[in-house]
Amino acid sequence: MFLAACDDDPFLVEWTENPQEAVLFALDRDELNSASAYNMLARLQVVIEDPLTEGRWDFAVDRQNGKMVFLPPRVLGIPSKGALVPFPGMEFEEMQRAPSDTLLYVTDKPVPVELGTIYVVRTHEQIGSYGRICVYYGKLEPLEIDLQAGVLRFLQDTSPVCNNRSLLPPR
């Protein structure tokens, strides 16, 4: 039997911060089928050449003009809400809320990957609880950029709350 107090919010998503590291490989590497994209909510490395991924990723990484860059899906011709906002000089723990100004989100051009910068990521649209169409917000911090090898190691965490810009769990 399920009992709830009158003050309980049945739609409240209880979650805790859980930053995790991930590694991605630049698209221009010679090896085929390397994970070069990332799904923030699922915390999955994605091989974008795999037809089963069907654009279910939020950004890819590549090397362009001597720099490592994030590629929002639209840069590669994938219709998506996936986007990034860089915040230079900010600490991972300081980033508590994704910006509400949609004009800040980069959707259509490469975003340089820089150490010492935190990136807010808006995910691709996906079906959330109760059948709603949702985007989710997360943050990431590049930890290591190996430009020669085309490898990026980063720390990320994502809120599992549909369409909610808060990057911290409810208190």
What are these regions (language model features)?
Residues C6-R171:
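Surface-exposed, beta-sheet-biased, low-hydrophobicity segments with strongly acidic/polar composition
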